[in-house]
Amino acid sequence: MSSQDKVAVVTGAAGKGMGRSIALTLAREGANVVVNYLNSKDRANEVVEYIESNGGRAIAVQANVFVKDGCEKLIDVAFKQFEKVDICIINPGAGWHPEPLDVFDPVLALEDLVQEIAPFFHLMRLLLPGMYERKWGRLVGITLHPMQSSPAYSYNVGKAARLQAMHLAYEEAWDQGVTINAIAPGPVSHFESFKQAIAYCNHEKEWSQRKNVSPQDIAEVVTFLCSEAGSYISGSIIPFMFKK
């Protein structure tokens, strides 16, 4: 699943979940990684330091990908450092407002909706011209399993909007050599420590002994989609199941 010398932007890559594991796994396969974060500077630097200590290249970039200026800042830094972006992972999403429909706040719900689709819209516009020119690109979004909706109505609507936005874009992008795919998990637990995330990424015994879906499960499939092996997969919605 080599991604040797590809440049990957992973948004929301400094948390304890999927984004961080995706960044680590893409680096494991040879990609140069832009580790995006909003507030978690120390955790972002931890990811970068680990990648570099293992022979890879990575940078941490603070940027709010829910707004146009933040997306422009992120990609500008990526271009200055690596000259291109081949892979972009749309990971972070909306807030959490699980209020019942009769009392939910429409203003907050609309904010949730915008936060789910804004990163894809802004980053797609910034990245597709270069990807089209090179006839190679990968866009992958983290959405939500349609059969495992959460208690938060606006969160569910936002994830559905992101999923549909990506699905409606894939055919046009495919004609230019760019694949667009969506990952649709249900609940996914976080890793308790950075050490645990590394152990899973390196397929140590914790990986083979796992009892439920983990951030690394998502990272492995995302990395496959971003490799040459995933060249002929586009428009897919890949679900992950959670053992209750």
How would you name each of these model-derived features?
Residues 174, 179, 233-235:
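Short, small/polar-rich loop/turn modules that mediate ligand/substrate recognition or access, typified
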